[in-house]
Design a protein with these regions (language model features):
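Non-catalytic interface/linker regions that flank or bridge core catalytic/transmembrane domains
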Residues: 1-45, 165-173, 185
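Divalent metal-dependent catalytic cores for phosphoryl transfer on phosphate-bearing substrates
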Residues: 43-185
Length: 185
């Protein structure tokens, strides 16, 4: 399946879009299951994620466990699956803005759009333009949030690396392959 400048396959993007149209989180049992796999600091980040993002993340985590088997599915691997997109909370964009930004970045280039967005100022609320940059750098921002929350190295690394080519991963290739496949990229 073809990819688009680090944004994953069109199938992945379409699935995320249609899944996000239903603005609810995972069922209570899945929510509890997820929280039980997270450290205390990670739980606060989890709760900041949108309902559709949490629902998607539970699916990624369960698929990762199915691919790796229970012996290789340590807590930090499950946390990496659950929180790989946590940096998106910093932009506070909804579904339609995310779609627009993703397509814009695919057409003009992610790095070009990040340069256009600039660096957020110290204002209380970043401008819409700055929030575009926050969304497009959610991998880096997520890693920073997770590091501050006390996450384990693998969880932090996967958030930072989940859009990179496999040869650039510091995460074990078997684990990275399972996380990537489970995410549908």
């Amino acid at each position: 399946v073809a990819t688009n400048g680090g944004f994953g396959s069109m199938r992945h993007l379409a699935g995320r879009f249609f899944g996000a149209l239903v603005p609810i989180g995972p069922p209570a049992a899945d929510e509890s299951w997820a929280v039980n796999h997270l450290l205390e600091g990670e739980q606060g980040l989890w709760r900041r994620m949108s309902g559709p993002d949490r629902r998607h993340a539970v699916g990624v985590a369960r698929d990762t466990i199915a691919l790796l088997g229970p012996d290789q599915s340590r807590r930090e691997v499950v946390a990496a699956a659950l929180l790989h997109d946590v940096g998106k909370v910093e932009s506070s964009f909804g579904t339609f803005a995310r779609v627009w930004i993703t397509f814009a970045a695919m057409f003009v280039g992610r790095s070009r759009l990040i340069r256009w967005a600039g660096t957020p100022s110290d204002d209380r609320r970043p401008s819409w333009r700055a929030r575009v940059g926050l969304y497009l750098t959610h991998d880096r921002l997520g890693a920073q949030l997770l590091e501050r929350a006390g996450s384990q190295v693998l969880t932090v690394s996967w958030a930072a690396e989940h859009h990179l080519a496999p040869e650039l991963w510091t995460v074990d290739a078997t684990i990275g392959d399972a996380l990537k496949a489970a995410d549908g990229d």
